[in-house]
Amino acid sequence: ELVGVLRRLDPDLLLIDIEAHVAIIGSSQLGIPTALTTFLFAIEQRPGVPPIDSWHRPNETAALRADWTRVRSDSRRATRRRRWSRRGLIDLFGPVSYGTTSRDALRSVARRTGFDLNARTDTSQWLRPHGYTGVPVLTTNVRELEFGDGASPDWHYVGPMVHTARHDAAASGTDDWRALLHRRRQRSHRPLVYCSLGSYWTADVGLLRRVVDAAARRPDWDLVIGLGGRGAPDALGALPENVLAVRWAPQVEVLAEADAAIVHGGNASLNECIAFGVPMLVCSTGHLDQNGIAARVEDAGIGLSHLGQTVESSTIEADLHRLLTEPRFSDEISALRELATSPPRSAHAVDLLEALAGER
């Protein structure tokens, strides 16, 4: 069905998510110039560089070897589990689902389309079941946060794709936020901290309560907590006067005013903080590449980081105080913001796509 639609549309260029494997392999037979997109940092295994879900820094040799051994072991274990499950039978005998990540299932798609799965994919990298070789990849990250010398020449760092003027239609807390903003503008400047632990995973109520406790000891700060639709403000208990918690916050509006942010290490929050020049305290929940983002934030000097499940309220308070009072954090992220949002950086993606489309 996908191939039929593409034949009718006859596009000049395909932009496909790096994890949309059926679309990548299925469309390969059409000869349409293709680029892949991702929010990830470089996924391939490179000398002296950890996998993107690791807390470790470059050149921690023994630790990096152990990290990559873990990645391979986890991948093999996941493959075995799937093969011995009901889904494993479906992978072998069909039908193939559009979102499958099973290499067994993708082999059947590759056979039908003439795609050489072994030659054109890389199973040694971080992403399951594989990455792709010889295909341009556009990542919405900045090269300055990458570890090592950067990925292969196919990997292009186009920077944050943040709509800074967007209206968050789902933001049920907009009125409460704007009332707080009005009060803030009637008095002398108070540091504003924004906290969001994402909208995909269930909120870590224990961590959020520790954040509230930290703010309660600092009545000279204002704290806004956006729950991303993953929890109710009532779950946090009674809140001090300087804390506002809402089910959905108008994130870009709040970040435009914030002096520091507490985030979980997701790529969207990382890039939005960069776009607005807001130093970060990353309290990683350990999902996907969050630990790796936490390591990059601290390594670049644009924030501090901890494991969200264990960080204490007193540590949160102390680290926020550092972010708010030590100029180096705001200086570093302001400089990174200038690089990330500069016209040459934005034009790179356009130039690349136009060049690819012109190859047809």
Predicted segment positions?
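C-terminal amphipathic helix plus adjacent low-complexity
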Residues: L9, S313-R360
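Nucleotide-sugar-dependent glycosyltransferase catalytic domains
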Residues: E1-L192, S199-T202, G206, D220
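A conserved nucleotide-sugar
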Residues: Y194, V212-L227
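Glycosyltransferase donor-sugar binding loop
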Residues: G198-S199, V224-A232
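A donor-sugar binding/catalytic signature common to diverse glycosyltransferases
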Residues: L14, V246-A295
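Nucleotide-activated donor-binding/catalytic signature segment of Leloir-type glycosyltransferases, i.e.
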Residues: P219, G231-A249
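Short beta->alpha connector loops at strand-helix junctions that form conserved
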Residues: T37-F39, G265, V282-G286, S305-T310
